[in-house]
């Protein structure tokens, strides 16, 4: 009977002696956590320098790329308002256009309002014998060498050239078009001498009179009308001879 009681007494002693120690340990741990909550751990100490190094590397790379991007990427501009490089502008102000020395248009213009360029703008200062470009048409080259003045761009139907003797000043109807009055007169004279018939005036398809007594091939007068009445009477007589029954049937109501 003494054994169980002895074991229970020992257990109670151990429990009573261990409680103060555990409480003391818990209090010490809480005090340490309250005293050093902001102190960084080992991992945080290692991460901060890495971030600083990465930030410096990114700044250096961005600085290198910024200089390159300024020269590579330019703003998209209108074709007629494209700005020239600063080097070309400075060279043009100095009068040095480079080895080629060609004239470059500053602004794109409307085809019908393009200003005529002077001789000096198309050629070098030292060139005295200047010729227009070879891609121009022949009639333009002929007019250039004949010192004909350049005219303003006109409507296709009202285009007149100073180097032409007979100008087409107004667009005409296809059936009434007379390009050269002298050629028209000569053609009419030759037709009159040969005795041929002149072509009649162009008419509307629904109003065109062909074979009329008063037409171009007929004679409008008393003789023509009498001839027309005679033809009508002859036609009625022939119809009566061919159908006597019809004639009798037509006369019956008249006799009654």
Swiss-Prot record:
Span of the signal peptide: 1-24
Tissue: Specifically expressed in hypothalamus and testis.
Span list, region Disordered: 76-128, 151-215
Compositionally biased region (Basic residues): 104-113
Gene Ontology BP annotations: adult walking behavior; eating behavior; histamine metabolic process; hormone-mediated signaling pathway; negative regulation of feeding behavior; negative regulation of glutamate secretion; positive regulation of gamma-aminobutyric acid secretion; positive regulation of insulin secretion
Keyword list, A-Z: Amidation, Cleavage on pair of basic residues, Hormone, Repeat, Secreted, Signal
Subcellular locations according to the entry: Secreted
GO molecular function: thyrotropin-releasing hormone activity
Modified residues annotated as Proline amide in this record: 79, 111, 156, 174, 205
Compositional bias annotation for Basic and acidic residues: 177-188
UniProt GO cellular component terms: extracellular region; secretory granule
Function: Functions as a regulator of the biosynthesis of TSH in the anterior pituitary gland and as a neurotransmitter/ neuromodulator in the central and peripheral nervous systems.
Family assignment from sequence similarity: Belongs to the TRH family.
Protein name (Swiss-Prot/TrEMBL): Pro-thyrotropin-releasing hormone
Organism field: Mus musculus
Lineage of source species: Eukaryota, Metazoa, Chordata, Craniata, Vertebrata
Gene name for this UniProt entry: Trh
């Amino acid at each position: 009977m003494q054994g169980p009681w002895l074991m229970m007494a020992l257990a109670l002693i151990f429990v009573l002696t261990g409680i103060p120690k555990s409480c003391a340990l818990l209090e010490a741990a809480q005090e340490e956590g309250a005293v050093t909550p902001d102190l960084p751990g080992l991992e945080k100490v290692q991460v901060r320098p890495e971030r600083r190094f990465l930030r410096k590397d990114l700044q250096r790379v961005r600085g290198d790329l910024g200089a390159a991007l300024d020269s590579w990427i330019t703003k998209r501009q209108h074709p007629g308002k494209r700005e020239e490089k600063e080097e070309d502008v400075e060279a043009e102000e100095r009068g040095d256009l480079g080895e080629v020395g060609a004239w470059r248009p500053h602004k794109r213009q409307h085809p019908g309002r393009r200003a005529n360029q002077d001789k000096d703008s198309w050629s070098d200062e030292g060139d005295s014998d200047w010729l227009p470009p070879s891609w121009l048409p022949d009639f333009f080259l002929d007019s250039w060498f004949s010192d004909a003045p350049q005219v303003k761009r006109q409507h296709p139907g009202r285009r007149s050239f100073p180097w032409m003797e007979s100008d087409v000043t107004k667009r005409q109807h296809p059936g009434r078009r007379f390009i050269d009055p002298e050629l028209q007169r000569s053609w009419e004279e030759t037709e009159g001498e040969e005795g041929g018939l002149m072509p009649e005036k162009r008419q509307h398809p629904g109003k065109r009179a062909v074979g009329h007594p008063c037409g171009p091939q007929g004679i409008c007068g008393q003789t023509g009308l009498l001839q027309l009445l005679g033809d009508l009477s002859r036609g009625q007589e022939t119809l009566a001879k061919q159908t006597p029954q019809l004639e009798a049937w037509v006369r019956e109501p008249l006799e009654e």
